[in-house]
Every structure is written in C-alpha cells, then in structure tokens.
Amino acid sequence: MRNTVKYQHKALIDKLTNLRQERKLSQEKLALTIGVDTKLFGQWERKLVEPKLFNLLCWCEALQVYFTISNDDGEF
C-alpha cells in the first residue's frame, strides 16, 4: 500500500500570508524572492491555485520559518 501525504494547505497559506503581511513584504517582493510569477503567488494566497510542496518550502524559507512534518503523535 502506498502512503499518501496530505496537508491542510488552506490553513498553512493563511499563516504564511499573515506572516508576509506582518513583515510588511509585498506579494511582488516575496514572489521575486522565491522565483515565481507575482500573479501565481497572488493566486496561491487567494487559494485559487494550490502550490506545490517545493514552492511551499521556498515560501517558508523566504519568511525564515520552518516547515515540519509529523504524525498525529508529534513524531515522524
């Protein structure tokens, strides 16, 4: 049986969007930092398009936050 990893992308995107706004970074600046089109970045924040995991990791890195994976017990 194949394991599938799912994530609550909407909650994560809300947190990343709030962090960007708190740090007073524009969508354009953050999109440029992570190497994606500003329009696409805006679609991610509006939850019109789901970013790939790689893009989420780049987004986290640009905001200097950690992306961790755990199971329900807090272990992996």
What residues fall within each predicted segment?
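A short, Lys/Arg-rich alpha-helix, primarily the initiator
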Residues: M1-E22
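Residues that mark the N-terminal boundary/hinge immediately upstream of a DNA-recognition element
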Residues: K15, S26, K52-N55
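Alpha-helical residues within the helix-turn-helix
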Residues: Q21, L32, E61
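Short alpha-helical DNA-recognition segment
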Residues: K24-Q43
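DNA major-groove recognition helix of helix-turn-helix/homeodomain DNA-binding modules
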Residues: K52-I69
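Short amphipathic recognition helices of helix-turn-helix/homeodomain-type DNA-binding modules
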Residues: S70-F76
